[in-house]
Amino acid sequence: PQEFEEIIVHYLSHGDKQLAKRALKMGLQQHPSFHGLLLLQSEIYILDENYEVAIKLLEYIEKLNPFDEEISLQRANIASKKGDHISSINYLHKALKISDDPDEIWNLLGMEHLLVENYIEASYFFKNCLSNNPDDYPSLYNLLYCYEQLNMTEAAINSLNEVLESDPYCEVAWHQLGKVYLKCGKIKEALSAFEFAIISDDRFTGAYIEKGKLLESL
């Protein structure tokens, strides 16, 4: 049954839902109660927006495998798609309790909190993602967005400096640091940050543009 799983996941990741459905049908004919295939069936129901059918199937799977985090992740996905972000957050916390790999769930929790404009909670989860992986630039951008909404300039500077401590040649962090300094009127520091971004990656056009605009305005 795992071979079928791999084939279905491959098709879904390439956006070929029809071939995924065909492979799933064959798999379930041979292994009708294999929970990995049943979870893929519910995932396809979700893609087709058959949410109620997916929920019933997930409830059935949960009776067989109550400690599978994927069940809660799919329930969270359904709740989010239906606009019920609070329920989605609750399901994600349930998944987090039994997960060995929290990064993805932290990110999802951050995104759900963003959607309800709870920037403090969102920033907590994006910061967790960043602590685990300083190269997680989407989480860095989301964290900086939260701090911007909260007017927490110092927190933004501190987070960027933490990234730079682990990777002093991170052009993205230098570039963002320059933009934060610029917003709070620290022109000299902003210019230095843009220059360090260029030193870190001399093909990074964003830093050249920001530096050029800054020099023009002086």
Residue ranges and their predicted role:
Residues 13, 47, 81-82, 115-116, ...:
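Register position in tetratricopeptide repeats
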Residues 30, 63-65, 97-99, 132-133, ...:
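Structural marker of alpha-solenoid helical repeat scaffolds
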